[in-house]
Amino acid sequence: MMKKISFAAIFFALAMFVAAPLAQATTVSEVQSMITQLRGKVQIIQISGKNAETKDRPGLLGQIDGISLTLDQGKFCNSVTKVRDFQKKVNDMISAGKLNQDPTLGPTGQELLADADAIAAALNELAVQSTGSQCF
């Protein structure tokens, strides 16, 4: 009887140890919050050029909405692809001199890229939790 109790206690302790990291794992709502924060930065970042408010900002916001939508659908790898597309657009705009790069004037293009990297990492974590493998 004592061996069964000891085995059960050890098994329970081991199960709690293995399950503990899952309690601290990234959640969809946490990633949505990160996306909302990125969206807020895109709404206020200084964008120069004649298409800033008619094409550039709406395009970036549309990409962010796409990330959010695929996340809600549980398509984590599709969301990562959309984050990478967003980053490409931001890099193109930085290269063209369209995005603010002075942190004293508000969000910068580099800040958008860093936030997008954090979102992609969190999405990969969700993919691992869901499927056991990362997105590529």
Features from the language model and the residues they span:
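Residues in flexible loops and secondary-structure boundaries
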Residues: 9-10, 15, 120
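Soluble extracellular-acting proteins and domains
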Residues: 25-136
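C-terminal segment of classical bacterial N-terminal signal peptides
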Residues: 15-23
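Intrinsically disordered, low-complexity Ser/Thr/Pro-rich tracts
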Residues: 7, 23-25
